[in-house]
Amino acid sequence: MLIQFNFKNFKSFRDEATLDLSASKMTEFSDRVVTVGSEKILPVAAIYGANASGKSNIYNAFEYMSGYVADSFKYGDEEEKFEEFRPTPFLFDSTSASAESSFEVYFTLPGDKAERTYNYGFCIDKEGVTEEWLNSKAKSARKYSTVFYRGTSDDELDLSGFPTSSRDNIQVALEKQVLIISLGAKLKVGKCKAIRDWFLANEFADFGDPFTNFFMSRRLPKGFVENKDVQQKVVEYFASFDEHIKDFRIEEVPHDGETKEDTYKINALHKMIDSDGMAEIPLGMESAGTLKMFALYPELQEVLEKGSVFFIDELNARLHPLLVRNFLLTFLNPEINSNHAQIVFTTHDTWQLSNQLLRRDEIWFVEKDEKGISTLYSLADFVDEDGSRIRKDESYEKNYLIGKYGAIPTLKSIDIFKED
């Protein structure tokens, strides 16, 4: 499970930002808090803020970190590729524009009976990796122990947490643009592979991006084509928000000679109102919301099975607030979410900003100042003008919209359409 994500000098975040999913001592919804080792962890983080405040950059930062962990060994001997994949720093001051960016996570691994906590991170600049570290902490330990540490010079390389044979292989193959974690995973070093696999298991969906919507809508659930039981599960999934779809009919489309991949035509079956027959409607003709929920199913299925993290940008796009709430309740119900999956999402849907749904430490805000610098903060840490913290019985939605918590747009009348 993700405990904490820290990043610095990435896009609009010049200074270090911390997204913390560790549970505070607040008492509301205590039954949803998951205990792993010595950590108490939350299943959800909801991120609010004005348009262009930098909310999506939190999503982008974790996606960047995950992508680099997965594939950094591809850039070791190709500087042009590395240049394309370098993180974008804060560009509005010359110092930050040329400085390194940093990314760090604290997390636990699913199925780890020892219930260790891991701390992994790296710093990267225009030349390559300047620092990288992996630490681990046993369930009963107070301090982290070093698995490896890497600095800028050769004498700042500590691989003491690896077997001797693995150390030699890594030292020989390591290049400046390559992370030890992704190189070690490629070399089948167990600890490195486990960490890389944790990143790979997490899912990302940007519903503000039409390309994401296009490609996700074409991803079919695992076993959907050949397994009628899987199709029935998808029907039951749809029944939680739309009972009109009773079944699916799947037809393989003949190859056109240009592609080797199998493609399918999917029709949704609806019950006729004047008979017991079924009307077939191409899935692509269903509503945008229905298509989005169909696209979400494979990712949701995998996240719940693996106990991984689902990052979603603009979750509310084209979905009714009640449907969004029902989707979130999937993660908040321990009977459904038995593998402790988590969801981190950005949204403008203030109806979910409720003390009937979320804890104060599950609600986050992003605000951008006049210099273009974004700041991330939690409702649990927010202090009002009187110096008081937010009570759990407050109307979060109302207070947010009147500006009590900040992170709302500053609006002016649109006068340009006035007639002279």
Sequence positions of predicted segments:
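Short acidic, glycine-rich loop/turn motifs
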Residues: 7, 105-113, 136-138, 270-275, ...
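Extended helical coiled-coil dimerization/tether regions that scaffold
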Residues: 8, 212-285, 396, 404-405, ...
